[in-house]
Amino acid sequence: MKHEDPVARLERVMRTVTAIVARPVRQFLTAASNHFASDCLLHSELARVLMADVGIEARTVVGFAAWRLGPGDGDVIMHVPRNPDALPTQQEVLFHTWLELDFLIADITTYQLRFKAESMDTADGGHTSVRWCPDFIVVRRGTVRSLEAVRDGHLVGQAYYCAASGAFQHKIKNGFELDPEDVEIARHLMINPVAGVVGRNHVMGVPHAPALLRTHNEAAKAHQ
């Protein structure tokens, strides 16, 4: 009997678990997040708790990230401050969060990249080509590209992740607490894939919320 490589096995398990927890978190926050597309810490912490429920002890990491969405010069989303060594202030709090387990990085917010690109285009009048917008990603830390490679290259689907200093991470995480009701809703959606959810974003017309909810509901019906 051929034994599976431990590294490959951990990556496979992490990818499976990430898919399981990403769906309910995405479904819930698309409907109800007060700061949709600026809520990475909430995404990561909810996912961390759900992973712990199934025995995966990942940790939330605060840092900086960039994603290459298309081949054009401007087809990049970057969450990188001008001075990554400076502590965050009220005037500039530019960061991203994701989950890490051993050598693996899991980001369940990448489904928001299209929305972020469209928001950026609305603000600056540009046009960002979005050829890559996965529901989530799981990558080995050693395969993450440099900021320069993502920013200046043209290979679609490349991502950059870099953890911030301990002091920076502490300042971002300090005082953040999950609402127990949010956790229970996410847990309910995880164990009940056919359950639907309608929240403030759906009612108030936040871009993409209705379409994303329809997608989630169609996926749920497929399980029936």
Task: Pin down the residues of each PLM region.
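A structural boundary/capping signal
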Residues: M1-Q224
